[in-house]
Amino acid sequence: MEKLALFDIDYTITRKETLMEFFKYLVSKDIKNIKFLPRALYSGLMYGIKVYDEKRVKECFLKFIENIDEKELAILTKSFYDERLSTILYEDAVNMIKKLKNEGYMVILISASPEFYIKEFYAIKEVDLIIGTKFIFENGKFVRKMSGNNCKGEEKVKRLEKVLKEKNMKEYMDERTED
């Protein structure tokens, strides 16, 4: 029986919330992106008072990369990982990933963060699979629309179950909650 090691990303293997770090990183690369700060604050407020759900808040928030070319976004996310994400990793978490992989575990990172940048965590060679929130690209451009649901809570469980089924694996857990 193959053993699984599941890790969330934000505040589990990173010290900070990665989507905000992505926004801050792009502002540091082009100060003109600061014009999207009011939208970010508004989105957060609407989520905080329960007017927006997580899907809508993410779609609204990501205006700062709307219509960016998919290849350009890939270059940005690679530099984001190299210059920023890799500096906020918990060393203990990375060491645990390496230890568990060495013990024969299949290592999966599963997060509500956008998959278009968390896939850069494959730079940690012990990571076997990354599951995140998927977004749509149309004609090679980012369009701020989520493909399906935000990968959090029950959706995270569904996505994991789908992967396990595809790999012909079984799951056993004592609780079906995740915050």
Stretches found by the model and what they are:
Residues E17, I68, E155:
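Conserved active-site and cofactor/substrate-binding residues in soluble primary-metabolism enzymes
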Residues I34-F36, K71, K170-M173:
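Short, surface-exposed acidic
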Residues E2, I75, D82-I108, A112-D179:
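C-terminal cap/substrate-recognition subdomain and adjoining C-terminal extension
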Residues G44-I49, K58-E70, I130, K134:
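Short, compositionally biased "basic patch" segments
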Residues I31-K32, Y52, E70-E72, E91, ...:
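Conserved alpha/beta cores of soluble small-molecule-handling proteins
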Residues R56-E91:
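Metal-dependent phosphoesterase signature
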Residues M1-I49:
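Active-site neighborhood of HAD-like aspartate-dependent phosphohydrolases
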